[in-house]
């Protein structure tokens, strides 16, 4: 069963939810069984460039802290922000899209995750909202609303 999913793309943690059969919103547990996913990414240099997102990224941060990124949302809409990993520069939109892809995968147990509404802080200006929509599109999502 498909439908519209809600995503909280948070600074520290993120989550995906969907309305159940009686119209009540329910958070969908991630692949690790948790209801929230750390908004973290780690580029593993020991496993051929594997990108870890969420709990796996948090667990990897002690091995290569310089290759782990958190609090990406603070940089949404900032065209000057970039993280250099092995000579490749990653901007906030690209990094946020990785978190959204993880949420999309985790939400798939409730049906195809395509149409989403993403929540952002009230203080987000139009540039930050647009960057969030771009990250959603990059993750293969149809962002029908930003709230």
Question: Locations of the language-model features?
Answer:
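N-terminal phosphate-binding loop and flanking beta/alpha elements of the actin-like ATPase fold
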Residues: 1-38, 43-147
